[in-house]
Amino acid sequence: MRKWIAMLLAMMMTFSCAFAEDLVFTGEVEEAGMTDEEIIEFMYGRYEASSLPNLVLPEGKKDVTVLTHYDLGPAKELYKELFGGEVIQIICGVQEYASKLQNLIGAGTVPDLVVSESTTDPCFVTLANAGLVQPIDAYIDYNEPELLDLKSVYEAGLWNGQHYLAPYDNKPVYYMIYNSKLFEEYGYETPWELWEKGEWTWDAFRELAAELNITDENGDYICYGTGAPGYGSLTGSTGVDYVALKDGFFENNLTHPDVVRAENYLNDMLFKDDIIKIKAQGGWRNYWNRGMVAMQIIDSWMLKGSAEVSQAIQEGTLGIVPLPQDPQKVQPGVNVTYAQSGGFCLVQGAQNPEAAAAFIRTIAYSHRYPEVGETYEDMLAEWHEDGWSNDLLYQYQVARDVENMVTSFGYGFMSTHRVWVFLAIQNNWTTFVESIRPLAEESLRELMGETTLAE
């Protein structure tokens, strides 16, 4: 795994580059640096021209009222610029959605949309079974250019033959980041280099995490291989969700052999084999800031919302890579992990459903196209201003490629049933599941009413 071997092999290869899906990011391209044209083509070249800017909404039917637990940000201004309508927010907590909708509908002040994400609990099924939201099929088409790459996520949210969840984005639950400076200093191939060779697996992660636990002459740690990962971070690469949403029922996979195998593997790294050191488990941010953590699995929001990550980007030491893949299922270049979709449900009795659909399209559009009067070069310049290099942007795009990801509906459900406790104590997954299974199954039955729970 020593880096000089990879460098020697790289010197024997000829430089090549290509656009769009033919672009292969090799070590020598990384050293030479991707051009602005290459990264723009890779990030945005697959999107055809959208008809959204030419869409006309009826007068008096342009405003959209949204029940949400977060501010909808710049998309509100873009929607107003495109359509002349207002986006009106009603803020409340996720757990309040059902009761808030009941009250609003009862009072005759019906919002058009309610935020719904695949990883939140309760999920959209709760709202659908209660008659609080309606199918959105008649109002939105996921063959539109800005929605096309979300079509598989749209289909994943099928419930009783109809679509209730309308996603505007999909991303991994987690990313893996690493400190490239430490890998160079200690002479190891980076996770990205292993990913490029199709060798970035649980076993490779485990080996690097162990070998990069480095002490000085006094026995004090000067480098930790990794801190504590999030729950489900390895399980996602098996392609099996804890509780999988099917069309009309949930499939309980808590005792699925792949889930058992992944959960026990990570628990062993934490406790049985003492690879993830106790000091780095809860305090990885402190050690990361001091340049003492080689790799870390982080929540996806942290990639753009964490001071620790932002600092590493500015310093040029950050690397991004897909999570380690299941060694029994790994395919070179295929990123399998849990994904989470941001989206909305159309509220029963919504006054402006066409405008609601246009707003969903607007958010998706804002992630994929320049704003009015801007260019793709302007979009790239904003990334550069934040310290992102073209090569880091390439890694980011590969790590967030959702084509083979599992849109997880069980992740949020299991969070409320304390699945994360399993990573806090040495345990066996099968034994642990028996302690939470009765309550989990009861909750699923409540969620689905009379709908079948598949074993």
Protein language model annotation of sequence segments:
Residues 209, 247-280:
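Glycine-centered hinge/linker elements that transmit conformational signals in sensory
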Residues 114, 158-169, 174, 184, ...:
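Extracytoplasmic/periplasmic solute-binding protein
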Residues 135-149, 194-197, 217, 241-261, ...:
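Short, solvent-exposed loop/beta-turn-alpha elements that line the ligand-binding surface or hinge
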Residues 23-48, 348-353, 367-455:
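Conserved C-terminal helix/tail region of periplasmic/extracytoplasmic solute-binding proteins
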Residues 310-381:
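Extracytoplasmic/periplasmic substrate-recognition and gating elements
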Residues 51-54, 70-85, 181:
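Short, polar/charged alpha-helical segment
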Residues 81-149, 162, 185-186, 294-295, ...:
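Extracytoplasmic "Venus flytrap"/periplasmic binding protein-like
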Residues 23-60, 118-173, 203, 321:
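Hinge/lid segment of periplasmic solute-binding proteins
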